[in-house]
UniProtKB/Swiss-Prot annotation:
Membrane topology recorded in Swiss-Prot or TrEMBL: Multi-pass membrane protein
Family matches, as Pfam families: AOX
Main location: mitochondrion
Stored InterPro entries: AOX, AOX_sf
Disordered: region residues: 320-361
Regions that span the bilayer: 155-175, 221-241
Protein name in the entry: Alternative oxidase, mitochondrial
Record's subcellular location: Mitochondrion inner membrane
Naturally occurring in which organism (per UniProt): Botryotinia fuckeliana (Noble rot fungus)
Bound cofactor: record note: Binds 2 iron ions per subunit.
Ranges of Basic and acidic residues composition bias in the record: 335-345
Alphabetical list of PANTHER family matching this protein: ALTERNATIVE OXIDASE (PTHR31803:SF3)
Length: 361
């Protein structure tokens, strides 16, 4: 005969704390079981050619979440963005090209075309149009190639371009700042505009990073491109600031063209994810540009960014027309009330190919 020994079991009811711990343990093991079951049946994601990014619009992890501070609730931008109206962004902003007038201009244009080719190759950019039919009509586009772009490809191009576009203003502003210090003289207002331009381009980049997460390969490309471009622009600006400003003016022409083509793609129905009414501009963009309620779609965001690029085009073509060591910055200068159109921070009197020196000095 076998004798069985049974341990004593307490007949007292569980305390509230013990019951809570037991329920948490049961829930944890149940969730783990569901996750392991799903992992066995989930399809394997396909590989991507250019980047290891995992999403087009960020829904989970934020690349740069706002830090949690006990006392600081909000930090205002150092350079508040000037207001743009929808009418201004649609009627005053369009693709335009300034024809080179001397050897310096031709060198700048040649360098931009080479950089454009390198960027197209690096980002796999292939579009179904070459350019707008005429400079004054941003919507007159004729397809000449099969359509090969998508929301993801456009975001790849945006992120790569904006990561480079923020370099010239910072380099030029830094060099002029240092020259003002060692020369013991004023800079005539150029530094602020150049640094504000770099800040604005960085805001473009941060906005797109709210919608797209680059992979390690693209991050490596950005690192290499920034190193090469920063040092090259640094040396060129020491040698010929005028050529560098003309270079940036031509570079911004390409940026205006890029955003014009992407807006046209969106309006023609080639980018359905961005046309979805539920796809809204990130809060970062809404606050920076002051986007009004009802005008916060991806299309509206691209119009704002294109207007910024058109402004940089005007500023740098104008600075390229001035005497680099003598003339004041016309975009922060005050003019008489009797003057009609005049340069400023907004796009009310936007000149696509820049102001000539005799118009502003």
């Amino acid at each position: 005969m076998t004798t069985m020994y049974v341990s004593r079991v307490s007949t007292r009811p569980l305390s509230a704390q013990s019951a809570a711990q037991l329920s948490k343990a049961v829930a944890f093991f149940a969730q783990s079981y569901r996750l392991s079951s799903n992992a066995c049946t989930a399809p394997t994601p396909s590989r991507r050619a250019f980047t290891s990014a995992s999403k087009i619009q960020v829904k989970g992890r934020d690349l740069f979440p706002e830090p949690e501070h006990g006392q600081i609730k909000r930090t205002e931008p150092a350079w508040p963005h000037p207001p743009y109206t929808a009418e201004q962004m649609r009627s005053k902003v369009y693709f335009a090209h300034r024809k080179p007038r001397d050897f310096s201009d031709r060198v700048a244009l040649g360098m931009v075309r080479f950089l454009r080719w390198c960027t197209d190759f690096a980002t796999g950019y292939k579009h179904n149009v070459e350019a707008p039919k005429k400079a004054s009509d941003s919507n007159a586009l004729t397809a000449t190639k099969p359509y090969q772009m998508s929301e993801r490809k456009w975001l790849i191009r945006y992120v790569f371009l904006e990561s480079v576009a923020g370099v010239p203003g910072m380099v030029a502003g830094m060099l002029r700042h240092l020259r003002s210090l060692r020369g013991l003289k004023r800079d005539n207002g150029w530094i602020e505009t150049l640094l504000e331009e770099a800040y604005n381009e960085r805001m473009h980049l941060l906005t797109f990073l709210k919608m797209y997460e680059p992979g390690i390969f693209m991050r490596t490309m950005i690192l290499g491109a920034q190193g090469v471009f920063f040092n090259s622009f640094f040396l060129c600006y020491l040698f010929s600031p005028r050529t560098c400003h003309r270079f940036v003016g031509y570079l911004e022409e390409e940026a205006v063209l890029t955003y014009t083509l992407s807006i046209q793609d969106l309006e023609n129905g080639h980018l359905p994810k961005w046309a979805d009414p539920d796809f809204k501009a990130p809060d970062l963009a809404v606050e920076y540009w002051g986007m009004p309620e009802g005008n916060r779609s991806m299309r509206d965001l691209l119009y704002y960014i294109r207007a910024d690029e058109a402004k940089h085009r005007e500023v740098n073509h104008t600075l390229g027309n001035l005497k680099q060591d003598e003339d004041p910055n016309p975009f922060v200068s005050e003019y008489g009330k009797e003057r009609g159109e005049k340069p400023g921070k907004g796009i009310e009197s936007l000149k696509p190919v820049g102001w000539e020196r005799d118009e502003v000095i």
